[in-house]
Amino acid sequence: MRFIYLFAIIILTLLIASCTSTSMKIYRAAGKPTICDGKNDGLGRIVVLPETAWRNDQKEPAKRESMALEEIKNAFLNLPCGSLSAPGGIKNFSTWSSKPESELLKQFSNEGIDTIILLRIEELTPYLYFTFSLPILWVGSNEADFRIRMLSVKTGDVLTDMRVRRSTGGPFNIRPAEWSRAELNAALHDIMGKEKNE
């Protein structure tokens, strides 16, 4: 009887551990759920301005910033609705939001940019939650949480303004921080729309 009980616990644990799921939530204030959709199809020369807004207790912010920049560059590589060639492109992390939008619009208008994409990374991290009831359970996940705001330089119109959260995990998962980069990359691809055909 004890063997059957132990076997059942092992099988149950394996079944629960295999229950990994992905969720993605988009909170839109303006525009459509994808960058390259409908009225946003001809964005011209684009500049991407990444920044961070980490928690006060964020671990290894420099490492996460480096991971984020790599994944932003990878995700925007085949952007189908605009050009990232000079003078546009993906800039280094800075505090872009500390400047008034009118100042950014003027600055990048003078540089020949058509569209500004402000991309603020707020979370790029693994989570681990425990319950101390019987049986003891833990749930692990990786999360990417960011805000994206896209502006037309000529008109100042807000083309897109949304918050995106994507996480993957489940019961009995232990996931390293490095896996969070895949969440950011996948979320960026999801909101980008169709990719450029080579």
Stretches with model-predicted labels:
Residues 1-4:
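Positively charged n-region of N-terminal signal peptides that target proteins for export
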Residues 7-17:
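Bacterial N-terminal signal peptides
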Residues 17-90, 163, 193-198:
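A structural "domain/chain start" motif
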Residues 53-56, 93, 122-127, 166-169:
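Solvent-exposed loop/turn segments at secondary-structure junctions
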Residues 64, 68, 72, 100-104, ...:
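Stable alpha-helical elements in mature extracytoplasmic
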Residues 89-99:
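Amphipathic, coiled-coil-like alpha-helical scaffolding segments used for oligomerization/assembly
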Residues 98-158:
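Surface-exposed short loop/turn segments
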Residues 136-198:
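Short secondary-structure boundary motifs at beta->alpha junctions and helix caps
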